[in-house]
Amino acid sequence: MRHYEIVLLVHPDQSDQVVGMVERYISQIKEADGQIHRLEDWGRRQLAYPINKIHKAHYILMNVECGQTTLDELEELFRYNDAIIRNIIIRREHAITEESLLAKSAEEKRARKAQREEAQQIQDSAEA
């Protein structure tokens, strides 16, 4: 089996259904004895250029290991799912399991925000 990196852009109106879609794709990969090495939900992000008058999309990243028939089935599902605006499948030499830069930066941003809120609470309690 080969390793692939899959990025999906989901229509922003369908963001609440992303979890169900991803679960369906994961179950299909696992049924075919494939593996999920990394799954990241990058959330709603601005597109570089509008696609069908849409300016934002919900991004999903998956690193999977599966056979060609499973990959063909996934491609067909992506093609006929109206909620998926764009997809890209890239073949990789090995499994990538570490967090992507986007996930790391989002995590760092959350940590900085938590520190600021904590500092604000300490300052507010000191003033009171």
Swiss-Prot record:
It comes from Acinetobacter baylyi (strain ATCC 33305 / BD413 / ADP1). The lineage of its organism: Bacteria, Pseudomonadati, Pseudomonadota, Gammaproteobacteria, Moraxellales. Belongs to the bacterial ribosomal protein bS6 family. Binds together with bS18 to 16S ribosomal RNA. Transmembrane segments: none annotated. CDD domains: bS6. Keywords: Ribonucleoprotein, Ribosomal protein, RNA-binding, rRNA-binding. InterPro entries: Ribosomal_bS6 (IPR000529), Ribosomal_bS6_CS (IPR020815), Ribosomal_bS6_sf (IPR035980), Ribosomal_S6_plastid/chlpt (IPR020814), Transl_elong_EF1B/ribsomal_bS6 (IPR014717). This is Small ribosomal subunit protein bS6. GO terms for biological process: translation. Coiled coil: none annotated. GO terms for cellular component: cytosolic small ribosomal subunit. Gene3D superfamilies: 3.30.70.60. GO terms for molecular function: small ribosomal subunit rRNA binding; structural constituent of ribosome. It holds the Pfam family Ribosomal_S6.
